[in-house]
């Protein structure tokens, strides 16, 4: 049937698609950050089509337990994780559901896990009643997420591997990690030489975690941006967003 109408492959067309803009990785004061959570949702609703306001949830391999100089740093992080588990997560899920309005403004449940070995990741959930899944590592997290509608996405990938930068040896190609976060207020992880250098407080960029390094290894993935800002203002100017081409602003179409 080659050359006939019946034999033509039907390709997706942009003629019936629209651009929708969101921020799927940003923070407020529900864990460590600034700005009220409701104000964050209101800010998102005023300028975005969809959002996930992201609590920090865990750091399984947090270092420094044997160094008394770092106790205040550990307490700062673990104290926030404790608050999230003592009612904070339920409040967060409830407010996410409150702001989710099909066809008007979509809200997604997500949360972040830090990792020295694997790099920091965000779990973005399709389900509005998604539980907070405990893990012993990012790889454990990915195993537990199998069979569920969850995207597990690495970010600020260009920091040094072993110090919360990305480790491409652990990349899982497929539906679980269909894209990676290349740009945020941390800077640009396309390479270690380009524009938008990384923030000084977590170190300079390193080639081994960058997008170009992953592509040279033959990895297949999409690219997204997020603000990763910590002041309760999703979609803040210049910090990164994600654009989606979809037929309509519904959960299924955006996902």
Where are the predicted features?
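Extended, charged catalytic domains and RNA/DNA-binding interfaces, predominantly
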Residues: 1-255
């Amino acid at each position: 049937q080659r050359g006939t109408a019946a034999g033509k492959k039907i390709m997706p067309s942009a003629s019936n698609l629209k651009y929708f803009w969101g921020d799927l990785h940003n923070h407020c004061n529900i864990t460590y950050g600034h700005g009220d959570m409701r104000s964050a949702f209101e800010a998102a609703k005023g300028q975005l089509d969809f959002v996930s306001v992201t609590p920090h949830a865990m750091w399984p391999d947090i270092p420094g337990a044997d160094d008394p100089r770092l106790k205040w740093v550990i307490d700062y992080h673990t104290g926030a994780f404790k608050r999230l588990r003592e009612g904070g997560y339920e409040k967060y899920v409830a407010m996410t559901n409150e702001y989710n309005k099909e066809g008007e403004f979509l809200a997604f449940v997500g949360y972040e896990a830090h990792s020295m070995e694997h790099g920091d990741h965000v779990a973005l959930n399709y389900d509005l009643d998604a539980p907070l899944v405990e893990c012993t590592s990012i790889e454990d997290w990915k195993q537990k997420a199998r069979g569920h509608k969850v995207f597990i996405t690495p970010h600020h990938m260009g920091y040094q591997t072993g110090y919360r930068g990305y480790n491409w040896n652990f990349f899982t190609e497929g539906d679980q990690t269909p894209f990676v976060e290349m740009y945020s207020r941390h800077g640009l992880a396309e390479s270690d030489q380009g524009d938008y250098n990384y923030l000084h407080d977590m170190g300079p960029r390193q080639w081994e975690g960058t997008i170009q390094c992953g592509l040279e290894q033959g990895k297949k993935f999409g690219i997204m941006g997020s603000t990763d800002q910590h002041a309760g203002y999703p979609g803040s100017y210049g910090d990164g967003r994600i654009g989606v081409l979809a037929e309509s602003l519904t959960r299924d179409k955006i996902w």
